[in-house]
Amino acid sequence: MMILGNLRVATLSDGYGLIPDAAILIEGGRIQWVGPEAHLPPSAAPRHDMGGRLCTPALIDCHTHAVFAGTRAAEFEMRLKGASYAEVAAAGGGIVSTVMATRAAGADELLAASLPRIDAMLAGGVGTVEIKSGYGLDIETELRMLRVARRIGELRKVRVRTSFLGAHAVPPDHRGRPDAYLAEVVLPALKVAQDEGLVDAVDGFCEGIAFSPAQIAHLFAQAHKLRLPVKLHAEQLSNLGGAALAARHDALSADHLEYLDAEGVAALAAAGTVAVLLPGAFYALRETQAPPVAALRAAGVPMAVATDLNPGTSPLGALGLAMNMACTLFRLTPEEALAGTTIHAARALGLSDTGRIAPGFRADLAIWEAEHPAELSWRIGPAPLHARLHEGEFV
């Protein structure tokens, strides 16, 4: 049991939910009480004076591909020189290069490559991170990626949620045969992953260069049979109706959404599906069509913000910078950006016990060298993190 006193607390219970001169009582890894310190109930718990600093929920990065091997720096140089996607792929670049590097990496090597990325996230105030598979595209490597993700959660003070993304791309050994790939690799791997307790949700990529709506619908039907929630990369490069498809399957989230239309917005709103915005990919790909944030806002669709950390299209490991990008590129408000990396990000992962500072919630907290929560989106550069708590313990 402990008391954190002399705080400015952004509870995220109603907008920022700011409480000046606040205190938080923590017991058993959970928040027992929060409010003005003058009203703190009598307690013998030790008190930590936080010097008037800002406290928010620990941030949640709800969309990452943080487990992979290799880099795509050479491809980055090629693109800057004008190479097309096809030219990059012909030279051995693109997702296939990451798949080959990840397949070649053993579990220990993959873990060693991934931990520094996670450590950088934690230094930015992240307390929960979602990690996808999807760079194996064979049964063995997809499972290895998920096992490494689970291992990260054991080695670091961070809550890890895993998403099975076998339907990320069609690998070279199944080129032109996406249905066979789903039947021979994706669905068998998903069943093993579920049996081993390796997967928290099932994801897919619905796009002309990946999988069709019908193929994703088949995948989601199988996920539901396994009692697993679903989420979807949708409307990133074109509109195939992926967001509406996700909504019909009660998806936790639909992610990217640059080409989302009015029908898709309405479907997300009706289903309560979270729209996950990924400004890092928008920036890195130099896209020009932004997600319809004003329409999402007007429809009451909850909007989350994430890094989409991956080696090809968003080598971004700083959630604070993603918040700034969401504001400057997509015109979110700083309040929306913070909600998008706390309470709405939690919802995108199916979590109901984190993302706010309220009694009964996990005491996953971030203490910042800041006076107002808008500073977290305003800053560009190192995160002003003073301390982080994981389940009520300083880390």
Curated annotation (Swiss-Prot):
Species: Cereibacter sphaeroides (strain ATCC 17023 / DSM 158 / JCM 6121 / CCUG 31486 / LMG 2827 / NBRC 12203 / NCIMB 8253 / ATH 2.4.1.) (Rhodobacter sphaeroides)
Listed Gene3D superfamilies: Metal-dependent hydrolases, Urease, subunit C, domain 1
Residues reported to bind N-formimidoyl-L-glutamate: Y135, N310, G312
UniProt catalytic activity: 4-imidazolone-5-propanoate + H2O = N-formimidoyl-L-glutamate
Binding site for Fe(3+): H63, H65, H233, D308
Name recorded for this polypeptide: Imidazolonepropionase
Membrane-spanning residues: none
Main location: cytoplasm
Gene Ontology CC terms, in alphabetical order: cytoplasm
Pathway: Amino-acid degradation; L-histidine degradation into L-glutamate; N-formimidoyl-L-glutamate from L-histidine: step 3/3
Organism phylogeny: Bacteria, Pseudomonadati, Pseudomonadota, Alphaproteobacteria, Rhodobacterales
Broad EC category: hydrolase
Annotated localization: Cytoplasm
